Amino acid sequence: MAQKGNIGVTTENIFPVIKKFLYSDHDIFLREMVSNAVDATQKLKTLAAQGDFKGEIGDTTVRVTLDKEAGTLTISDHGIGMTEEEIDKYINQIAFSGVTDFLDKYKENANAIIGHFGLGFYSSFMVASKVEIITKSYREGSKAVKWSCDGSPAFEIEDADKAERGSDIVLHIADDCKEFLEKNKIEELLNKYCKFMAVPVAFGKKTEWKDGKNVETDEDNIINGVEPLWTKTPSTLKDEDYKNFYRTLYPMQDEPLFWIHLNVDFPFNLTGILYFPRIKNNIDMQRNKIQLYCNQVFVTDQVEGIVPEFLTLLHGVIDSPDIPLNVSRSYLQSDSNVKKIATYITKKVADRLSSIFKENRKEYEEKWDDLKIFINYGMLSQEDFYDRAKDFALFKDVDGKYFTFEEYKTLIKDNQTDKDGNLVYLYANNKEEQYSYIEAAKNKGYSVLMMDGQLDTPMVNMLEQKLEKSRFTRVDADIIDRLIVKEDAKKTDLTDEQTANLSQVFRSQMPKLDKTEFFVEIQALGEANQPVLITQNEYMRRMKAMSQFQAGMNFYGQMPNSYNIVLNSDHELVKKVLADAEQHTAEALKPVLAELKGQEARLAVLHQSQDKKKPEEITQEEKDDLQNTQKAVNDEKQKRDNIIADYAKDNNIVHQLIDLALLQNGMLKGAALDAFLKRSVCMIK
């Protein structure tokens, strides 16, 4: 006899909330339905194991059946089933109090509803206009019953014709959700959410190629493996088992470096396998490869709140019943179990890396280039991971040799300590472009690190804070004798006038490059060093690089690139240029320099006179006189600079020296490079 009624009065608001707030994530309904079927099957197995069920368990397969013509999707199990009383208890009456408070709390975070307080079943109404439950309990003498509801609080329950125990959940798919009547869509969702559920899940039959087409066989198409690798005892597994499982998870990925098998049952339950992938340089492309499961049911691959951010670069699976199927981000951030899990995983990762380093240093070094970005990311983002990793993190020098932090400190402390007692770490980020700078450092007996990774700039900044009395400088940041200052630098013996003239010779001929500034300086570097070098200030270069990582540093990113053109006043060619410039410009400069000298003397007198007066005591005539004299000085300097520039533009040695320095830094390109090559040929003839 049919019975009609209303689902418990406290549920009147639930259906609109499900429809409205869960609509954007309605795919999860299938996970909930299949998960419930698996639970019912598992409960029957438990009852049988305890002796509370004496019958035959039989086929435990959960079946998902699609009937496009009828517009239905059915999930069937042979689990414990339900009596009419149990339907009333678990379906008609939702077993929690304070539903209004609950809805107010979670309406802005819809995912938190499903999975709490027995609401998982109701996710079916996200896609169905009507839901039917046809069920028969495992209990002796139970009658089969059919429950139906159209999404309103009203329901109907009646006797049903069902011989076998278990439940069939029949979803009549709504008109606006017809995509869930497509075979490919259901296969996609089953593969996503149910791939490792603990009992077999069948969807249709397997097919085989016969008579030029695919035809169905009698064999069930089982979409899941019921005993995934992470549920097995590590001691029973071989390396090939882990590699095969990785290929199952990530068919298109390269073979992993190594892995960690997690297995803990106190103070929380956690199993899983984490793989170290061969990480490429782009960190952002590597995230969201860890899959989170709850009792073998897929939850999410957005695990930032569950594992520390740097561990999201790992691949693999984490399974924990202590993390609910559906949780909000704020829940993850505050839950004590989640925090313990994050700490545990971090420690296990550090322990695994440390053990590989200690047990097989050679293998560890071979894998360092792939591990480096991961370990650096961890050290930058987690203080406790830095404390562990500092003992197995490595430096790599330009010759491909590896050192721990402590080993490298011991290596360089005698030769690379400056006059102020600071240990100077020299590094390069491009061996080819910085070759001559690297060789100059080696000729001094210095060691040069290779730091060409995506995170090396912030890593350098951090290490300068962590390592006592230490600083890092790129090998092309200055001339070699000023990278590690052992004693006061030798002074150039040029006069002020010679310094100004020589600087203008080269300054006037520097190329006009976009967002680039050149500053000329003169140093006495010795006859054996290069005549002209280009260096880039370490601080400014590093700040520009850091602007790509940190918000609020855009100011540095917008600034032009600044380079120093260092002229070696001891070099024969530079001396030749200066002597030639003095000879060819002497006559033209003579009256200009004489006038300049006179105007500068007058300007000095005017400044001296006005400096003795208060601002209000200086007359307008005196102010004008000072301004006009300053203008006259500037005009004469401009005349001098123009004369020198006119000379320099036709001096092939000047252009050749500049271009050689630019070429050394990879800055000579296009038409300028072509002109350099042609000039070189002409000078050789």
Question: What function would you assign to each model-found segment?
Answer:
Residues 113, 131-154, 174-178, 184-685:
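GHKL/Bergerat-fold ATPase module in large chromosome/replication-associated machines
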Residues 1-180, 188, 195, 590-595, ...:
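GHKL (Bergerat-fold) ATPase N-terminal catalytic module, capturing the glycine-rich phosphate-binding loop
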